[in-house]
Amino acid sequence: MTTSTTLGRLAAACAMAGIFSGPALAQASHDAVRIGFITDMSGPYADTDGLGGLEAIRMAVADYGGKVLGKPIEVLSADHQNKADIAATRAREWVDERGLDMLIGGVNSATALSMNKVMAEKKRVYINIGAGTARLTNEECTPYTVHYEYDTVALAKGTASAVIKQGGKSWFFLVADYAFGHSLANDTAAVVKASGGTVVGSIKHPPQSSDLSSFLLQAQASKAQILGLANAGEYTVCAILAAK
């Protein structure tokens, strides 16, 4: 409850800072302040935020009084179905047709990158709360980007370095074949090697895979001490269950 409310208050605060300053003031001259939320509402990452994340945003808006400088706050939401083109199209439509002032992006790094690009083009604030790719922190960060979520560099340094210190020297990666998986595997591998460990192999699985048994057999055959799961949500659960 506290985390969700704090998250939402951050969004409201950024809305005020971004919308009601300088040239952005004219962008919020319509009858309401519109905040969009695009995430996975029905797929493998839906339990990470999904409808729960939407409700948290609505609760935060209510806590804030439902208004910013006398204008009501309206929350729009959509399911990107884990497709970058759908996420980008909806974000663009909301700005052009609904007067969207700020967008909150949920899980899935590929969709987050596409929404980030659209919002930069439209000069609107984009808050990433669910995607972990370090590209949002680094080369694809814009003056309109707020990366509230952790990124894969931070995750890799905190986790891999601790495992190495405990003796986990040889690694094999099971990688979700999209932006987040690639970033996490690459960043973790860099930490492993810099810490004196080795990466004996990796294998990519399609984002749609729910049966990861065959991939895990290859990981087992590698004789690595550590299996690094560079995936998330339902796919991480499936991998853990299959590993049993």
Label each residue range with its predicted role.
Residues L51-M59, P143, A154:
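A general alpha-helical scaffold signature found inside nucleotide-binding enzyme cores
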Residues P44-E55, A179-S183:
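Glycine- and acidic-residue-enriched helix-capping/strand-helix junction motifs
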Residues T2-L25:
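Gram-negative bacterial Sec-dependent N-terminal signal peptides
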Residues A60-Y64, S114-K122, D187-S195, A242-A243:
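Alpha-helical structural signal in soluble globular domains
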Residues T89, A134-R135, T142-K244:
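Extracellular/periplasmic Venus flytrap/periplasmic-binding protein
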Residues A32-G50, G106, S170-L174:
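Short beta-strand segments enriched in small/hydrophobic residues
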